[in-house]
């Protein structure tokens, strides 16, 4: 049911490059065709300040709403309630992002969360790091990674081919949209907090990018960054 709703939202929001009026230099370069690959932006460390840049360069991006909650805060005039949405976006092929948005209505909260998730997009390292497998095909993660957010801590471990994603529903959604098919996970803390759980999983995936590898190790692990060929 959730996947069908996501597909309908994606159809409604098919990106029109011609109608887009970029506000930043990078956005203008993308619209002109000077930049045609999102890897160029990420490798150069350029800031993603417009979600439309991601829409233009990754048209196959999918989104999934993980959670919508009613939250409250105290004000001198009384309690003020807003909706908080948690969303994960990815193309199931090496790119993923997690975002949160708040608003007085559900729709705007989800749209804000989607925009935030697109701006936080990262490349994911995918490989075959399990000693039980060694197939060399990028289907899992290349090595163990840890991430944290709030009280939640997540540890990702490489798994052999065919195991699947042994994880909670939130972590499974993040890993699945990142393009990882097999992985084991360990979780600690209050994983009922959806955003913290999603962000901790996202942090673990991001930490994979900070591990240095020799060319021979990359070849042995079948390591790829971004799109899996």
UniProtKB/Swiss-Prot annotation:
Chain ranges of the S5 DRBM domain: 61-124
MF terms in GO: rRNA binding; structural constituent of ribosome
Gene Ontology biological process terms, A to Z: translation
Keywords from the named record: Ribonucleoprotein, Ribosomal protein, RNA-binding, rRNA-binding
A Pfam family per the record: Ribosomal_S5_C
Domain commentary: The N-terminal domain interacts with the head of the 30S subunit; the C-terminal domain interacts with the body and contacts protein S4. The interaction surface between S4 and S5 is involved in control of translational fidelity.
Name of the protein this chain belongs to: Small ribosomal subunit protein uS5
Species assigned in the record: Methanococcus maripaludis (strain C7 / ATCC BAA-1331)
Gene: rps5
């Amino acid at each position: 049911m959730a996947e069908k709703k996501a597909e309908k939202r994606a159809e409604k929001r098919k990106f029109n490059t011609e109608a887009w009026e970029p506000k930043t230099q990078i956005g203008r370069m993308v619209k002109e065709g000077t930049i045609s690959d999102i890897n160029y932006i990420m490798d150069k460390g350029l800031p993603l300040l417009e979600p439309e840049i991601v829409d233009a360069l990754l048209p196959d991006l999918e989104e999934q709403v993980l959670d919508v909650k009613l939250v409250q805060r105290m004000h001198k005039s009384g309690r003020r309630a807003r909706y908080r949405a948690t969303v994960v976006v990815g193309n199931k092929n090496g790119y993923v992002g997690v975002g949160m948005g708040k608003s007085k209505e559900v729709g705007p909260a989800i749209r804000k969360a989607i925009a935030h998730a697109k701006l936080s997009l990262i490349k994911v390292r995918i490989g075959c790091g399990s000693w039980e497998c060694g197939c060399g095909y990028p289907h899992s993660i290349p090595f163990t990674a840890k991430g944290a957010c709030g009280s939640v801590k997540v540890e990702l471990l490489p798994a052999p081919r065919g195991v699947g994603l042994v994880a909670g529903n939130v972590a499974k959604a993040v890993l699945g949209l990142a393009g990882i098919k097999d992985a084991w996970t360990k979780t600690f803390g209050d994983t009922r907090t959806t955003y913290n759980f999603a962000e901790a999983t996202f942090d673990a995936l991001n930490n994979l990018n900070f591990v240095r590898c020799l060319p021979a190790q990359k070849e042995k692990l079948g390591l790829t960054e971004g799109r899996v060929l």
